[in-house]
Amino acid sequence: MGKKQHQKDKLYLTTSEWKSIGGHKDDTGTRLQRAQFKRLPINHCSLSLLPFEDPVCARSGEIFDLTAIVPYLKKHGKNPCTGKPLVAKDLIHLKFDKGEDGKFRCPVTFRTFTDHSHILAIATSGNVYSHEAVQELNLKRNHLKDLLTDVPFTRADIIDLQDPNHLEKFNMEQFLHVKLDLKTSEEIKKEKDAMKDPKFYIRRMNNACKSVLDQLDKEYVPKKSSTETDETADEINAAHYSQGKVAAGFTSTVMAPVTSNKAAVLDNDTVRYSRVKKNAFVRLVTNFGPLNLELFAPKVPKACENFITHCSNGYYNNTKFHRLIKNFMLQGGDPTGTGHGGESIWDKPFSDEFISGFSHDARGVLSMANKGSNTNGSQFFITFRPCKYLDRKHTIFGRLVGGQDTLTTIEKLETEEGTDVPMVSVVIMRAEVFVDPFEEAEKEVQAERAEILKKTSKDAASLANKKAKETATKPEAVGTGVGKYMKSAAAVNKRQGKMEDVPLEAAKKTKFARAGLGDFSKW
């Protein structure tokens, strides 16, 4: 023993230990080894390579599905794994025992079969046992009778279905039908369907992971696929910013490249809400009298549209105010009358709309009831006195402008003992809408679109007329090349190679003055 003998002992798992000891080494050699050895699970058919439903086996220990092996034997007459002769009457029907969790187990020891279990089958009965049970209770005691049925058997009737020390039988790469690719189109289709399951590609999976995935398969409900429609922006719903697809396609590797920017499309609600300029007015006719309400539609459009639509379609008709608290508020809007129901016109809760200038500072404030942030539905309440502590917790969208006497009469009603339910029911018999700015905004949008369509069609017609005039005034081409629009006969003849013969004058010779002594005339 030397000094510092443990100085290299780490308190963590090193990379080399993880690869070598942990069995996670992944290099060319291990990848080649995995490619050469692909193990088939014990619960899979050796022919279809899929989980079996009616298992049978050959004397050599290969397990098949009865519906897969019988047609194969009729066609080929040999073992699809070894190539040796095999007929259907030589197949042995296997009887697997299952536990409460649905997994195969030994019917004697009750131990679940795993990839490392030594599994045997008795040919005379077809029962499947663990090697331990047969070794201890049959072979050592020389009691060669089936442990469940007492059917006699010999040692030759013991078939090795799985031996963890000899797994060559489960190597799919060595199966004859895999090597020769003796698969039918139906088998290939089944394999392709199995490959669609993500679990097909999982190399290792413990029992806990298997149970979780099985539970997920039972409870998982896929979402309905929705196809995105590429809306085209017009002059009304076009935003002042783009869709951002060019930048996303340039910076993201998962998006297709886009080279042209398009304006973002505003949703229909945003377009309509921008054209709402005046408040709405609604009357709730109760069995104690009317309640006239003013709704702040330009400031709180979502809550106001939700309330007005429910009033228009009769959603609030014959509903009760289910909650009454003196000196606090009167709550209603639930068709069930329990305080737990009611939906918005969008069939889902909508977000809060808090306006800084609005407050629960007076009697008769109309506000949305909710179960928390952004959970507004159809329920609303009217205050009996100022409740400023409700500010920025509930959306204020209106106020009482008529029917104070009715509200006072309702406030004086007694409630059931221990509850806030009025002893005398307060019922909304009907709701009347006097002014609906959202309907007017919708008509305005439709009118603007019709005007734009009319203008567009008019511009298109004028452009077509302009092109027609240009085509009519354009001279007709009489040829090609330079001067193709010239209609003179000479030009035409010139282009056609028919120039008239024009007499040419003889070229005059140029006289040059001579230098020097030509004669003696001037002497």
Curated annotation (Swiss-Prot):
Residues 278-433 form the PPIase cyclophilin-type domain. It comes from the Eukaryota. Residues 38-111 form the U-box domain. SUPFAM superfamilies: Cyclophilin-like (SSF50891), RING/U-box (SSF57850). GO terms for molecular function: peptidyl-prolyl cis-trans isomerase activity; ubiquitin protein ligase activity. Its EC number is 2.3.2.27, 5.2.1.8. It holds the Pfam family Pro_isomerase. The keyword tRNA processing does not apply. Its main location: nucleus. The keyword Transmembrane does not apply. Keywords: Developmental protein, Differentiation, Isomerase, Nucleus, Rotamase, Sexual differentiation, Transferase, Ubl conjugation pathway. Exclusively in the larval body wall striated muscle cells. GO terms for biological process: cell differentiation; feminization of hermaphroditic germ-line; protein folding; protein ubiquitination; sex differentiation. GO terms for cellular component: catalytic step 2 spliceosome. InterPro entries: Cyclophilin-like_dom_sf, Cyclophilin-type_PPIase_CS, Cyclophilin-type_PPIase_dom, Cyclophilin_A-like, PPIL2_U-box_dom, Ubox_domain, Znf_RING/FYVE/PHD. Pathway: Protein modification; protein ubiquitination. It is found in: Nucleus. It catalyses: [protein]-peptidylproline (omega=180) = [protein]-peptidylproline (omega=0); S-ubiquitinyl-[E2 ubiquitin-conjugating enzyme]-L-cysteine + [acceptor protein]-L-lysine = [E2 ubiquitin-conjugating enzyme]-L-cysteine + N(6)-ubiquitinyl-[acceptor protein]-L-lysine. Interacts with mep-1. May catalyze the cis-trans isomerization of proline imidic peptide bonds in oligopeptides thereby assisting the folding of proteins. May also function as a chaperone, playing a role in intracellular transport of proteins. May also have a protein ubiquitin ligase activity acting as an E3 ubiquitin protein ligase or as a ubiquitin-ubiquitin ligase promoting elongation of ubiquitin chains on proteins. Influences the hermaphrodite switch from spermatogenesis to oogenesis. Required for body wall muscle cell development. Belongs to the cyclophilin-type PPIase family. PPIL2 subfamily. This is Peptidyl-prolyl cis-trans isomerase 4. It comes from Caenorhabditis elegans. The gene is cyn-4.
